[in-house]
C-alpha cells in the first residue's frame, strides 16, 4: 500500500509551512551573534536615533550611566542618598577592617578599599541599590590561594601579589562585560552559589573562633577538620576574658538582627550594630589596657588617603600562576554575587540592571583599585540590603559613602587602632550566620533533588576540602546535569484534549485521546550528534510499544531549536526504517533554522513537502482523511 496525504501547500492561505529561500551565511551568522551576545539589543534605541548628536549622547549614557541619571538629579533624591550613604559607611568601616583581617592583609587596606571603588561604581554602575565593598568569601579565598607560608614569611610580597591579582580580576571582569560574555557567569547556578556561600560561611565562622578564644597560634587551612583540630590543640591558649567579650558582642549583634527582622523600619539598628561594637570595643580596650589582659587589638592605623600602588604590582613569572588563579576565580565569584544581588534588589523596585554594564563597572572599579592600594571589591549583600532599606534612590549613595570614608581616613583612622580583634571576629560571625540559607536548601530538596545535590556538593566541598575544590565539584555537577539534558532530550507522546484542537502530553493529561492509526511524538530540544542516537532509539521504542498497528508517525519539531547533519541523517534513517514497515513520517512545524537546514540538505525533497505541516491539527486532519479514503491493495 502506498499512502499519500494532502500536501501542506494546498492548505488555506497562511496555513502551510513556509518553504522560502534559506538565508545566506552572513545573515545567519549575524543573527546568531546578536542572540548570543546582544539578546537584549541595548543599542537598538541608539541606532534608531536620527540625530547624530543625540545618538552620541545616548551612546555615552549607555557606557557611562552617571550621564543618564545625574541631569535628572534633585534635592529630594539627595536627601535619601545622603542618609543611605552615611548608614552604609557605619557598616563599611568595621567590615573593611574585619575582611582585611580575613584576607591576612593590613586593616588599613580594607578602609582604602571602601574609599576609591564607590566613586568608580557611581560613575559606571547601573544599579540604584548596590553598595560596593569587600566581601568575606573572596577575602578568605585570596588568602587560601596564596597560602600560609607566603602570608607568614613574606607579607610585603603577599600584599603586592594581592594588588596584582586585583588588577587581573578587574581586567577579566572588564573584558567579560565589554565582550558581553555574561553567559559564563551563568555556569555558577543559583544552587552552586547557595551551597558555596553556605560552606564559606561555615569555615569563616570556625576561623573566627581564633579571635573569640584569643588564640595566638592557629592554622591557615580552611577545612573544618583542620580548623577544629587547631582549636583543640591550642586550648592552653584560650583566654576567658576574650571569650566573654566575644560572646557579649555576638549576642548584641544577633539581637540587633532580630530587631531588624521583627521591626523592618528599625533596619538602622542592625546597620549600626557593628560600628557600636567597634566603638565600645575601642573605648573599653583603651580604658582597661586590653592588651595587658590578653585582648589583642588591630594595632596602628595611619591617617591619610590611599597611596598609589601601581609601582608595587608584581608580574614575576614565579607567581603568575597563583596571581591568575586568585584573580580569575575570585573575579567570577564576585561577579556572580554582585550581579545576582543587584538584580534581586532591582526587582523589588521594578527596575532593571544590565549585567554586562555591571561587569564593566566592577572591572574598572578593581583596575583603578589595584592602582590605589585597594583589593577586590564587589556588591556585598549586607551592605546592599542596608542601602536599599535606607531608601537609596541612585548610585549617589556610594559617592556619599566614599566622602565619609575619606573623612575617616583623613581624621579618624588612628582611633580604630584600639579595636579588639575579638570584636571583629564577632562582627564577621554575625554576618556569616546570615549567609547560611537553610530555608533555600530545604526548598531545593523539596523541589529538585539534583539541584540539592549540586548545592550540597558545594557546601560540603568547601567545608571539608577547600573553597576552590568545592566550587569545581559543584560546577562539575551542574555541567554534567546540563550535558544530561542535552544528551537525553525530553520526548513525549501527545494526545488530543477532548472537544478541542489542543494536543498535550498523555502522561501529564491522562484524559487526552489517542487516535488509532497514527502516533504523535514531540521533541523538546535540539537534535545533534550528542543525542541523535538516543532520539532514534526513543522514537522507535515508542512505535514498538504501540498496541495497535500504525500508518503515520507525526513528529512535532516546534521545540527543536536547531539540528545538525547527524540529526538530519538520524531523521532520514528513522524514515527509512519506518518506510520498511509501511509507516509514513510527517514533520510538524519545523523552526526557521531547522527548516533552512532541511532545505539545504535536500531533506525536504527526500521526505516530500506533502508530509510537512504547520500544526498538529492540520497533520491529524490530513492523516485522518487518508485513513478513511485509502484502501489497501489486494
From Swiss-Prot:
Q: Which residues lie on this side of the membrane: Cytoplasmic?
A: 1-81, 126-130, 180-195, 261-265, 343-358, 417-420, 480-634
Membrane topology category: Multi-pass membrane protein
According to its UniProt record, which protein family does this protein belong to?
Answer: Belongs to the SLC26A/SulP transporter (TC 2.A.53) family.
Supply the gene name: SULTR3;5
The protein, known as: Probable sulfate transporter 3.5
Q: Which GO terms describe its molecular function?
A: secondary active sulfate transmembrane transporter activity; symporter activity
Its GO CC terms are: membrane
Native species: Arabidopsis thaliana
Which NCBIfam families is this protein grouped with? sulP
Domain (STAS): give its ranges.
508-623
Per the record, what ranges lie on the membrane's Extracellular side? Answer: 103-104, 152-158, 217-239, 287-321, 380-395, 442-458
Q: Polar residues bias: where? A: 1-12
Q: Which UniProt keywords apply?
A: Membrane, Sulfate transport, Symport, Transmembrane, Transmembrane helix, Transport
Amino acid at each position: 500500500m502506498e499512502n499519500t496525504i494532502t500536501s501542506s501547500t494546498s492548505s488555506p492561505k497562511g496555513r502551510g509551512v513556509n518553504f522560502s529561500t534559506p538565508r545566506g551565511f552572513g545573515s545567519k551568522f549575524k543573527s546568531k551573534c546578536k542572540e548570543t551576545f546582544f539578546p537584549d539589543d541595548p543599542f537598538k534605541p541608539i541606532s534608531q536615533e536620527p540625530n547624530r548628536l543625540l545618538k552620541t549622547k545616548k551612546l555615552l549614557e549607555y557606557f557611562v550611566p552617571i550621564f543618564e541619571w545625574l541631569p535628572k538629579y534633585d534635592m529630594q533624591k539627595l536627601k535619601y542618598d545622603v542618609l543611605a550613604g552615611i548608614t552604609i559607611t557605619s557598616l563599611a568601616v568595621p567590615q573593611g577592617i574585619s575582611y582585611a583581617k580575613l584576607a591576612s592583609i593590613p586593616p588599613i587596606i580594607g578602609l582604602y578599599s571602601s574609599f576609591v571603588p564607590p566613586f568608580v561604581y557611581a560613575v559606571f554602575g547601573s544599579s540604584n541599590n548596590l553598595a560596593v565593598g569587600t566581601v568575606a568569601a573572596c577575602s578568605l579565598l585570596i588568602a587560601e590561594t596564596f597560602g600560609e607560608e607566603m602570608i607568614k614569611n613574606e607579607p610585603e610580597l603577599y600584599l603586592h601579589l594581592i594588588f596584582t591579582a586585583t588588577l587581573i580580576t578587574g581586567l577579566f571582569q572588564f573584558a567579560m562585560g565589554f565582550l558581553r560574555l555574561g553567559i559564563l557567569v551563568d555556569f555558577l547556578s543559583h544552587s552552586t552559589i547557595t551551597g558555596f556561600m553556605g560552606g564559606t560561611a561555615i569555615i569563616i565562622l570556625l576561623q573566627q573562633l581564633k579571635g573569640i578564644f584569643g588564640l595566638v597560634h592557629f592554622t591557615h587551612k580552611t577545612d573544618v577538620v583542620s580548623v577544629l583540630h587547631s582549636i583543640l590543640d591550642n586550648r592552653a591558649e584560650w583566654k576567658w576574658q576574650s571569650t566573654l567579650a566575644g560572646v557579649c558582642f555576638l549576642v548584641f549583634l544577633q539581637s540587633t538582627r532580630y530587631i531588624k527582622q521583627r521591626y523592618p523600619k528599625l533596619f538602622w539598628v542592625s546597620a549600626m550594630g557593628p560600628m557600636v561594637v567597634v566603638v565600645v570595643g575601642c573605648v573599653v580596650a583603651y580604658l582597661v589596657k586590653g592588651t595587658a589582659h590578653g585582648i589583642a587589638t588591630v594595632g596602628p592605623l595611619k591617617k591619610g588617603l590611599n597611596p598609589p600602588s601601581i609601582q608595587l604590582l608584581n608580574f614575576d613569572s614565579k607567581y603568575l600562576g597563583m596571581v591568575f588563579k586568585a584573580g580569575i576565580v575570585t573575579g567570577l565569584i564576585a561577579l556572580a554575587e554582585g550581579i545576582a544581588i543587584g538584580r534581586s534588589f532591582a526587582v523589588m523596585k521594578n527596575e532593571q540592571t544590565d549585567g554586562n554594564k555591571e561587569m564593566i563597572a566592577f572591572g574598572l572599579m578593581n583596575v583603578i583599585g589595584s592602582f590605589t592600594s585597594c583589593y577586590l571589591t564587589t556588591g556585598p549583600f549586607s551592605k546592599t540590603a542596608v542601602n536599599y532599606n535606607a531608601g537609596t534612590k541612585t548610585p549617589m549613595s556610594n559617592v556619599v559613602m566614599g566622602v565619609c570614608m575619606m573623612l575617616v581616613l583623613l581624621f579618624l583612622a588612628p582611633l580604630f587602632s584600639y579595636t579588639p580583634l575579638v570584636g571583629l571576629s564577632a562582627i564577621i560571625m554575625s554576618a556569616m550566620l546570615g549567609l547560611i540559607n537553610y530555608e533555600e536548601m530545604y526548598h531545593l530538596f523539596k523541589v529538585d533533588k539534583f539541584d540539592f545535590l549540586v548545592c550540597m556538593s558545594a557546601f560540603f566541598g568547601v567545608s571539608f576540602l577547600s573553597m576552590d575544590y568545592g566550587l569545581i565539584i559543584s560546577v562539575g555537577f551542574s555541567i554534567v546535569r546540563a550535558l544530561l539534558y542535552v544528551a537525553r532530550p525530553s520526548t513525549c507522546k501527545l494526545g488530543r484534549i477532548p472537544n478541542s484542537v489542543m494536543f498535550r502530553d498523555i502522561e501529564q493529561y491522562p484524559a487526552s485521546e489517542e487516535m488509532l492509526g497514527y502516533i504523535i511524538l514531540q521533541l523538546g530540544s535540539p537534535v545533534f550528534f550528542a543525542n541523535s542516537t538516543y532520539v532514534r532509539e526513543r522514537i522507535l521504542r515508542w512505535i514498538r510499544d504501540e498496541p495497535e498497528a500504525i500508518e503515520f508517525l507525526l513528529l512535532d519539531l516546534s521545540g527543536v531549536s536547531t539540528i545538525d547533519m547527524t540529526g538530519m541523517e538520524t531523521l532520514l534513517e528513522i524514515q527509512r526504517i519506518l518506510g520498511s514497515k509501511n509507516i509514513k513520517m510527517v514533520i510538524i512545524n519545523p523552526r526557521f533554522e531547522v527548516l533552512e537546514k532541511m532545505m539545504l540538505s535536500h531533506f525536504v525533497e527526500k521526505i516530500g513537502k506533502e508530509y510537512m505541516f504547520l500544526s498538529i491539527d492540520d497533520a491529524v486532519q490530513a492523516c485522518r482523511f487518508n485513513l478513511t479514503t485509502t484502501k489497501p491493495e489486494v
